[in-house]
Amino acid sequence: MSTDLQTLTNQFKFNNEIYGRTTQGIPPEQWLIQPCQESNHLLWVVAHAAVTRAVAVRLLGGKWSAPWQSLFTRGQQRVDNGRYPSVAEVQQAWNEISRRLLSALPTASPELMGQPVEKGKPSIDGTVGGTLGFLCLHESYHLGQMGFIRKWLGHGQGLG
């Protein structure tokens, strides 16, 4: 495995640990509380990060889908809380997607990582590897939001 791919794998693993610490101990009834009317609740942020993590799985040749995934794509407006999947479903999805991603990353070939991606798709350098790097950065951004929401809900820091 190349150094770049090993670093990316380690970053996704570390993000997975941060996710666990950030969401640990928050009761399901608090996952739908918004810090303000214009912001997303924890369930939306976590599900969005999971759906985006699944993009990485698909780039690496894997599969994952859920009937609710379109509720959490970029730019989607919040819907009535009753339309969202349960906290348990979202956590199960995160765990399943994470297993698939962390299994697929070490087997990614240099040829796959160097393949160009469609113009306009987010990528650090226009390649599949660059898109995976962008997705990891994107995920880290949302982990920060999760940490803020955690603290705002009164559960203290997830890290540190």
PLM regions: where:
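Basic/polar N-terminal segments that are highly enriched at the extreme N-terminus
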Residues: 1-6
